[in-house]
């Protein structure tokens, strides 16, 4: 767990992973995942980033990684089908991975597209965070080439529909793909 405390802030593309360990326990009251699951997801992200970096710096720089409940969402543009297959294979080799959601496209994004995508993600994150009817902490967002990818846990279908509605209001959003699951009623 000490390794996670040191390494978690260095994982830039994993929104949930960038939270420090101290903040982790405070946020756990709002987060649908347990602290153990958050730590496991963080570890998966760190190990996958490391494996991709060791394999190729291109892999590391071009592939976005989000991990939620052991489900790994891979996004970004890669140069070839082989590069995409290698990334998926690498993800499956990481311990505790339960699913790999391959949303990588063949073809690289321009610097303008990358900046625009980051802006879309920031805008959507802000909108859902400020919406009192959405538990934003339970969502991770990636945007690639104008496509918004969502992963996480919605409290109900109404909440998920609100998140998607917020995404639809943003300029340059071409498509929204949801890998969000609806919370099970206990």
State what each model feature region is.
Residues 1-16:
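Sec-dependent bacterial lipoprotein signal peptides
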Residues 12-186:
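N-terminal targeting leaders
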């Amino acid at each position: 767990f000490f390794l996670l405390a040191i390494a978690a802030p260095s994982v830039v593309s994993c929104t949930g992973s960038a939270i420090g360990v101290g903040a982790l326990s405070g946020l756990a009251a709002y987060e649908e995942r347990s602290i153990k699951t958050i730590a496991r997801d963080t570890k998966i992200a760190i190990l996958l980033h490391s494996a991709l970096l060791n394999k190729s710096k291109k892999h590391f720089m071009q592939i976005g990684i989000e991990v939620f409940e052991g489900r790994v969402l891979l996004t970004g543009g890669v140069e070839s089908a082989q590069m995409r297959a290698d990334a998926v294979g690498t993800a499956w080799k990481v311990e505790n991975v339960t699913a790999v959601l391959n949303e990588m496209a063949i073809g690289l994004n321009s610097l303008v597209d990358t900046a625009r995508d980051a802006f879309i993600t920031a805008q959507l994150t802000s909108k859902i965070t400020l919406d009192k009817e959405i538990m934003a902490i339970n969502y991770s967002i990636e945007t690639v080439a104008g496509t918004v990818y969502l992963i996480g846990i919605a409290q109900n279908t109404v909440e998920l529909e609100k998140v998607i509605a917020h995404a639809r209001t943003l300029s340059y959003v071409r498509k929204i793909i949801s890998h969000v699951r609806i919370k099970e009623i206990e």
